[in-house]
A protein has these predicted regions:
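Alpha-helical solenoid repeat scaffolds of the TPR/TPR-like class and their adjacent stem/linker regions
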Residues: 1-436
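Short secondary-structure boundary/capping segments
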Residues: 158, 193, 375-376, 462-463, ...
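PAPS-dependent sulfotransferases, especially Golgi type II membrane carbohydrate sulfotransferases
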Residues: 270-273, 285-347, 413, 418, ...
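ATP-dependent adenylate-handling active sites, centered on carboxylate activation for C-N bond formation
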Residues: 279, 440, 448-450, 460, ...
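Short beta-strand segments
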Residues: 358-360, 371, 383, 444-449, ...
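Conserved nucleotide-binding/hydrolysis micro-motifs of P-loop NTPases
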Residues: 386-387, 475-478, 530-531
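Glycine-rich phosphate-binding loop used to anchor ATP phosphates in small-molecule kinases
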Residues: 420-458
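Conserved phosphate-donor/acceptor-positioning beta-strand/loop module used by diverse small-molecule
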Residues: 459-482
Length: 619
């Protein structure tokens, strides 16, 4: 490139819209940045820039920051000022690029911690928790006594599903503050709610909202906890009071609409979540679509669901991770064969409390089965509180071996590896004891983890005689029910109906493989039987598990599905309803209005419809 061309290139502004030249921003040569001596010369001007910003002389501060950063892209005071200005201007790409640069700069531990907290909070604000974790962890490691860093890591871990770890960091933040903080306590309360520890959550919410009654998110969380505890009138009253104070708050309005839907008031949902004046978010579209479905307006309902899925893909980057999970399934099938598993050691003797593993693609009815089992004396609902997937990730370290799961299981054949299944079982049981599931009266604890289809091989090693109950539902009803949800699923398969169908087929094929290679205590249960013939179907499940038949509650109590068992309680309990058959073969009515609705997934699902015995329902 000629000299003139190079000069033009050097003058080009950065694509991130920071206002800096790109050779001083995203395309900068870090090795050419000024050293400490040069930065010290500019430090006074950097502090003057901060002073201008603090005095609200924003134009002057911006001009000075751009000038200084053109000389020294790593001058922290000027970089922080430009970051704050671009953040206020909502220039997202620039805000992120500058935050990443700030977090990467060397400095005193407290300064590095603050910069990493800033970056983590940026990601948290966008729901990008996986990306938020490294800077949040870096902040805590740099300054472990920083309460804000502990709090932010608590948020990241909680929203990533690592609830007990999140709780520890929240409690550490409170201890470091040396006082109660309304925001931290409200976030701790939400964490406890997700753990099913509802009574504790209420106590923390009440304390948090006394300190910070202006915490809208906390008010909404408190209402959700009361709803989950069965105090629905109180929950709705709390939401009504909050909406009277903040009538334009969309989250509170959405929660109130969900309350309307739970009470069967679909018209109220449509009135509360209108199409205008604002464009609806994905969750709002789904709730409105569900209300339309209740009013027998299936075409409009599907239009809302389709719009929600489009938003998930376009705004939130939710695209099906087909290749990654196909490769994972192939690896599991290659490893988990009868020949390879036969010599591996098993845990003995039988566990004190028998886990009952529940399988079922999302919206197949496994949560309903868990709710019904939770009403039976001697059962506790383990839901997804301590998934075996966490153990599988820990195996390489526990085995003192390199390699990934499942190949690392070969180390069970070497030296002390034979004791590892028992150690893994103990860790699994200890986690459930810490959650409060191992009560003296409990003999069976359900495990409804979404990762269970992948863990059937590990289940066989840790709990050789554990019952595995697979809840099945007509595949087209499964597709339709998932279409109506704004919920991120494994592999982002929620992104579209074809993605749902492909992942359904992948998991069903994986389960079929495990059944062909392992001797599992496996019982298939149809959702349709569970909701139309509840007591006999549950009786068959209890007999298979080995629970005494006298423990089963009467049919009327089962169908009411309203008993409140001891905690912790799974999140799905908050949305439970009396057992009903509205969803049985629901796809038929939709197909009658939209014959091509399932056209894209028929080739994928028809073989499973036949194999599962649902072909007659299609006739």
């Amino acid at each position: 490139m000629g000299t003139v061309g190079q000069e033009k290139l050097d003058q080009a502004l950065c694509r991130c819209a920071s206002g800096l030249r790109r050779v001083r921003c995203c395309d900068a040569d870090i090795s050419a940045w000024p050293g400490l001596a040069a930065l010290e010369v500019l430090e006074a001007q950097g502090q003057e820039t901060v002073k201008l910003f603090n005095e609200k002389q924003y134009a002057e501060a911006e001009a000075q920051a751009l000038k200084l950063l053109d000389l020294a892209p790593n001058l922290r005071p000027a970089l922080r000022v430009l970051y704050e200005i671009r953040k206020a201007q909502k220039r997202g790409a620039a805000e992120e690029a500058l935050a990443i640069r700030l977090a990467a700069l060397p400095g005193e531990p407290t300064v590095r911690a603050a910069a990493n907290v800033l970056l983590a909070q940026h990601y948290v604000g966008q729901g990008r928790y996986a990306q938020a974790r490294p800077p949040a962890a870096e902040a805590v490691m740099a300054s472990p006594k920083d309460a804000t860093a502990q709090h932010v890591l608590g948020v990241v871990l909680t929203e990533s599903g690592e609830l007990q770890a999140g709780e520890r960091h929240y409690r550490r933040a409170v201890a470091l503050l040396g006082r109660d903080d309304g925001v931290v306590l409200a976030n701790l309360a939400w964490n406890l709610k997700l753990q099913g520890r509802l009574d504790e959550a209420v106590a923390f919410y009440e304390k948090a909202l006394t300190l910070r009654p202006d915490n809208r998110r906390g008010q909404g969380g408190y209402a959700q906890v009361e709803f989950a505890r069965g105090n629905r009138e109180k929950a709705l009253r709390l939401l009504d009071e909050a909406l009277a104070r903040w009538p334009d708050d969309r989250t509170l309005r959405l929660l109130r609409a969900m309350g309307d839907l739970a009470q069967g008031n679909a018209e109220a949902v449509l009135a509360r979540i209108a199409d205008a004046p604002e464009a609806l978010h994905a969750t709002e579209l789904c709730i409105r679509g569900q209300a339309l479905a209740r009013l027998a307006r299936p075409v409009e309902a599907v239009q809302h669901y389709a719009s929600a899925k489009q938003l998930q893909r376009e705004r939130h980057g939710q695209h099906y991770q087909a290749e990654e999970f196909a490769a994972k399934a192939a690896a599991y099938k290659a490893y988990f064969t009868a020949e390879r598993l036969q010599p591996l050691p098993r845990a003995v003797p039988p566990p004190a409390r028998q886990p009952v593993f529940l399988l079922g693609f999302p919206r197949s009815g496994s949560s309903l089965l868990e709710q019904l089992l939770g009403q039976v004396p001697g059962f506790a609902m383990g839901d997804e509180f301590s998934p075996l997937a966490d153990l599988s990730r820990a195996i390489p370290a526990l085995a003192g071996a390199t390699g990934d799961y499942p190949e690392v299981l070969d180390h069970l054949l070497v030296g002390d590896g034979g004791a590892l299944p028992q150690r893994l079982r103990q860790r699994y049981e200890e986690a459930r004891t810490q959650l409060g599931l191992a009560r003296p009266d409990v003999r069976f604890i359900t495990d409804r983890s979404a990762s269970n289809p992948w863990q059937l091989g590990l289940i066989k090693l840790l709990f050789p005689e554990a019952p595995v109950i697979h809840v099945l539902r007509h595949p087209l009803d499964v597709m339709l029910s998932n279409l109506a949800q704004d919920r991120r699923l494994e592999a982002n398969c929620n992104a579209s109906m074809p993605a749902l169908a492909r992942h359904y087929a992948l998991l069903m094929s994986l389960i079929r493989h495990f059944r062909g290679q392992l001797t599992l205590r496996y019982l298939p249960v149809r959702y349709e039987d569970l909701v139309t013939d509840t007591a006999p179907t549950l009786g068959r499940v209890l007999d298979f598990i080995g629970a005494p038949p006298a423990a089963q509650p009467p049919e009327a109590l089962l169908r009411a599905n309203s008993a409140m068992p001891p905690g912790p309680l799974p999140a799905h309990v908050s949305g439970r309803e009396p057992v009903h058959a509205r969803g049985v073969y629901r796809h038929r009515a939709y197909q009658s209005h939209m014959p091509a609705l399932f056209a894209e997934v028929r080739d994928i699902l028809d073989p499973w419809i036949t194999e599962l015995g649902y072909a007659e329902a299609e006739a």
